[in-house]
Amino acid sequence: TRIDDDLQTSLRLLVARATQLPLEKLQQVCATYRELHFSRGVITLALAAARASDAADIALAFRADGCPEEVSHSRTVYQQRRAMYALVLDTLGALDAQLDTASNALVGTKDAAAHTRAADAEKERRDAYALATQSDDPLFHEELYTWLLAHGRTGQLLELHTPFLEEFLQGVPVLLNGESYATYVRGLRDLLWQLHVRRGDFFAAAQTLDELAHADAFALKLSERIEYLALAVGNAKSVRPSAQVHAQEVIGFATQLDEDLEVAQVQAKILGALQPLDTLDWDEEEKA
């Protein structure tokens, strides 16, 4: 249509001048695009503007340094890029809500129009996420993954096929969604081994679980350590030797895991036997 052609033309012209587009103007344009249901325009323009605003990748270097807290030009550039990414995330969130509304409207109805609206909403959302995840901007991917986790969309996160996801799950986070560092990192590693399982890399899953079981930073209960080790054993036994993982390496690793699991289980039995004795000693003192 004429409107679609005009929107595409405006997008092309704005992307070409993205370096000259201040944040406030970008926000205004994206708001207009959203009103016109031009999600592709919001995503394309906001991501282009974020990269154009920081051609030297100052924000990327700032993130690599762990986002130092002191006020600096680098922090300002980083925060500006985050504000631009937020326009994309707001659009994705609106499409999620639109699909939820359309899907809920299907309950108890066979109305053809309602089914068409739901199908259209699903397609618009799917296309938007596909476009966003095609970005080669690592900072945006970190924002997207963190946002998905904050909204409890772990299943959706693990379904993504991007070259940045594994690195994010095994990396050092700076955006913690209000959680403690140890709690957030443990959550990432839990998702990492699940990602490996989804991809059929059982050896990597077993290694991640083994690292979780032996990580002092997480202050695991013995029962949690046993659970991680049991999962590691199960994954190790699912590994098929290959050019990347030799049979001897798999056998040695699985044996070590079995031994660690057995030791942990013995510790649990001993603790279980000692607890009634502690209670008994306490009762005897009370009687005395």
Predicted segments, located by residue:
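Extended alpha-helical assembly domains of large eukaryotic scaffold proteins
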Residues: T1-A288
